């Protein structure tokens, strides 16, 4: 048998992207292409060696050119020594060829007639032809055309993590390129690490920025590779278009698509469904965080079940006897999963996978310290710090998900007194962390300051308007005009804080993490419908309109039930309010709140020069219903709270929150039986929308 000469490997060509190929339209082969850019979707380019042409393509010809249905034969003479090949060698070659045919069949890179010819001709002549064909085909060029399903992929390809069946040959460059990976790591440390605290910052810097090994794991370890790709992916999703062009000279969608493909490919290799490594689960959680920011569909909500099961299989909820470093990493990871589970349940909406009992019984927050205070060799316990630390915002988020589960998904918490008590405990735990926090010091301090105030408003709103109302097993209280105004003010404060992050330059790094919540938006729309305070409605309606536009832009293509219901309710409220309010409340700004005009139109402080612009004289923590001294007095309900001394000069809080410190909101409200008008209108609108959708489905069938 003649020995084949070495063949030059073909360079990968830039072919039509996946979407243009599926839609069968001409692709201009740009990155991203014009068709995908105009459609507003992510362009996934395809790069692979071109198929044989000219004289090479004539090797596959038809027996009868006049017969279009004739099978294809291979015009290669059988080798002279074919009869001397051992049976086992022939079987091995046939097995290899069948594997190639199976892989090519999945990607449609070879004609169906040729596959049929390979499968049906089983005589000796066909076997000799197959053997000759195998020797004449560049096996490497065929392997890159279709992906192989590894038996250790843990089923992730079945879950759709791979996106499509045509892998991009340049996916690894985003990880192997030292400069790109270092820049994305820097973006992660700036934009993601302050709000999603599951990694150890110094260890990450030594690994991705200084080139050292990560926590003693060998280089090329599957878990380490998947974590690096997940860091690049979530960092790419946190970029703005301006930052993407400034750092990488390309669009955000292009860098996100490449990073996502790299992350999904490395996750398949690391098999998070089967891996016992906590590092692999960290990578999977970061993938879910990035996917949720990029894709508003229910994909992350579905995949959360796997993250919760894996965490329980690794026994993350249980306090172990590991060293201090491992304990902190396990606590951070488990509470981050609890937070993501709570967030995805609110966005759908549905009940969380982790029950209230599981979340509260395993609630053991990590230390309120900086990452520089400990390392993997730390064996002793480290006490909590005072003031703002690397973990302040994360600790507040952990308390938010714990209180949110009790207020929204716990049927046992029915009486208003206990609900308001939960709110008060939440305020004590979170606002304690706000002591000594100067919002003018850093963008992170500014963001933490305003988000904590937003969380407090959200907790108070959930105490009065929990999601449990939609289950009809909790009586809806009726409120008078003043109390209804307080509800509208709470909802407006949440929407204003969201808009502030999207307009103030100090919130640019964290805008990817902040979206318009549909619950306060729905409550604000409903309250505007029945509110009798004309001046309040006149101030509120532009904020509601702008928040609605941003919400619709963010959930485009998903959450249809909520989106359609909100849109119909908005049309109903517009018809009532706009004729009476006139054109003074019209909104013509961008729904992304990216301009100064939007900030001025919404009366949101854009860049306050000092703290005096966001607070007023006398607005102190001591003005709350609980005194500052109570913050430093430990008790059973504060066993998990950081100990801090009484501040001699406590920081000031948003005056809107202080104006709502009434006995009704803090001490509890009286039990009333009739339904409130605004919530009744909201539930009526939901019922009407569901009935209309059912009628539409019947008409289609």
UniProtKB/Swiss-Prot annotation:
Presence of keyword Methyltransferase:
no
Key words, A-Z: DNA-binding, Metal-binding, Nucleus, Transcription, Transcription regulation, Zinc
GO MF assignments: DNA binding; DNA-binding transcription factor activity, RNA polymerase II-specific; zinc ion binding
Q: Which domain of life is it from?
A: Eukaryota
User: Gene3D superfamilies recorded for this chain?
Assistant: Zn(2)-C6 fungal-type DNA-binding domain
Q: Name one GO cellular component term.
A: nucleus
Q: Which residues bind DNA?
A: 17-43
- Give its localization: Nucleus
Under InterPro entries, the record lists: Sec_Metabolite_Reg (IPR050613), Transcription_factor_dom_fun (IPR007219), Zn2-C6_fun-type_DNA-bd_sf (IPR036864), Zn2Cys6_DnaBD (IPR001138)
User: What SMART domains does UniProt report for this protein, alphabetically?
Assistant: GAL4
What Pfam families does the database record attribute to this sequence?
Fungal_trans, Zn_clus
An example Gene Ontology biological process = DNA-templated transcription
NADP: is it a keyword of this entry?
A: no
Q: What does this protein do?
A: Transcription factor that specifically regulates the neosartoricin B biosynthesis gene cluster.
Protein's name according to its UniProt entry? C6 finger domain transcription factor nscR
Q: What phylogenetic lineage does the species belong to? A: Eukaryota, Fungi, Dikarya, Ascomycota, Pezizomycotina
Gene behind this chain? nscR
């Amino acid at each position: 048998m003649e020995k084949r000469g070495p063949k030059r490997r073909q360079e990968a060509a830039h072919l039509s992207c996946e979407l243009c190929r599926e839609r069968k339209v001409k692709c201009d082969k740009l990155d991203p292409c014009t068709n995908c850019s105009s459609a507003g979707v992510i362009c996934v380019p395809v790069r692979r060696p071109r198929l044989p042409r000219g004289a090479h393509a004539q090797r596959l010809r038809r027996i009868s050119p006049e017969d279009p249905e004739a099978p294809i034969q291979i015009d290669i003479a059988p080798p002279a020594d074919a009869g001397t090949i051992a049976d086992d060698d022939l079987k091995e070659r046939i097995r290899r060829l069948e594997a190639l045919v199976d892989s090519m069949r999945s990607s449609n890179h070879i004609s169906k007639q040729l596959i049929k010819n390979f499968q049906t001709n089983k005589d000796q002549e066909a076997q000799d032809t197959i053997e000759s064909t195998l020797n004449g085909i560049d096996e490497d060029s065929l392997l890159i055309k279709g992906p192989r399903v590894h038996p250790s992929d843990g089923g992730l390809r079945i879950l759709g993590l791979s996106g499509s069946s045509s892998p991009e040959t340049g996916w690894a460059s985003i990880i192997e390129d030292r400069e790109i990976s270092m820049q994305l790591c820097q973006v992660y440390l700036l934009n993601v690490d302050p709000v999603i605290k599951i990694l150890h910052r110094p260890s990450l810097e030594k690994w991705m920025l200084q080139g050292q090994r990560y926590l003693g794991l060998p280089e090329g370890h599957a878990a380490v590779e998947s974590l690096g790709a997940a860091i690049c992916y979530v960092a790419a999703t946190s970029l703005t278009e301006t930052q993407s062009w400034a750092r990488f000279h390309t669009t955000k969608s292009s860098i996100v698509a490449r990073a996502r493909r790299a992350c999904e490919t490395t996750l398949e290799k690391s098999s998070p469904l089967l891996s016992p490594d906590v590092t692999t689960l960290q990578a999977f959680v970061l993938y879910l965080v990035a996917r949720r920011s990029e894709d508003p569909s229910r994909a992350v909500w579905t995949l959360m079940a796997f993250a919760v099961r894996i965490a329980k299989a690794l026994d993350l909820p249980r306090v172990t006897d590991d060293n201090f470093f491992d304990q902190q990493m396990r606590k951070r990871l488990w509470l981050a999963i609890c937070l993501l589970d709570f967030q995805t349940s609110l966005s759908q909406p549905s009940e969380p996978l982790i029950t209230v009992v599981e979340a509260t019984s395993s609630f053991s927050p990590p230390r309120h310290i900086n990452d520089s205070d400990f390392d993997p060799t730390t064996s002793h316990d480290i006490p909590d710090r005072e003031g703002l630390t690397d973990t302040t915002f994360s600790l507040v988020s952990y308390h938010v998900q714990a209180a949110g589960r009790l207020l929204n998904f716990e049927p046992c918490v029915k009486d208003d007194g206990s609900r308001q008590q939960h709110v008060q405990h939440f305020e004590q735990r979170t606002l304690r962390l706000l002591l000594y926090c100067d919002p003018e010091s850093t963008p992170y301090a500014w963001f933490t300051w305003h988000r904590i105030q937003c969380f407090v408003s959200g907790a108070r709103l959930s105490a009065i308007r929990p999601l449990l109302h939609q289950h009809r097993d909790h009586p809806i209280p009726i409120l008078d005009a003043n109390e209804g105004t307080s509800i509208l003010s709470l909802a407006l404060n949440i929407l204003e804080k969201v808009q502030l992050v999207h307009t103030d330059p100090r919130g640019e790094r964290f805008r990817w993490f902040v979206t318009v919540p549909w619950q306060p938006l729905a409550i604000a729309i409903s309250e505007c419908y029945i509110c009798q305070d004309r001046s309040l409605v006149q101030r509120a309606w532009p904020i509601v309109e702008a928040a609605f536009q941003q919400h619709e832009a963010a959930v485009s293509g998903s959450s249809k039930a909520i989106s359609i219901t909100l849109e119909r309710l908005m049309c109903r409220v517009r018809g009532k309010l706009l004729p009476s309010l006139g054109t003074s409340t019209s909104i013509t700004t961008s729904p992304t709140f990216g301009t100064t005009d939007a900030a001025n139109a919404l009366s949101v402080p854009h860049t306050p020069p000092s703290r005096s612009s966001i607070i007023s004289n006398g607005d102190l923590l001591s003005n709350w219903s609980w005194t500052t001294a109570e913050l430093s007095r430990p008790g059973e309900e504060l066993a998990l709270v950081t100990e801090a001394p009484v501040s001699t000069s406590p920081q000031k809080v948003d005056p809107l929150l202080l104006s709502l410190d009434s006995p009704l909101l803090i001490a509890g409200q009286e039990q009333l039986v009739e339904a409130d008008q605004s919530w009744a209108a909201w539930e009526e609108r939901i019922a009407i929308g569901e009935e209309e959708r059912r009628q539409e489905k019947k008409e289609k069938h």
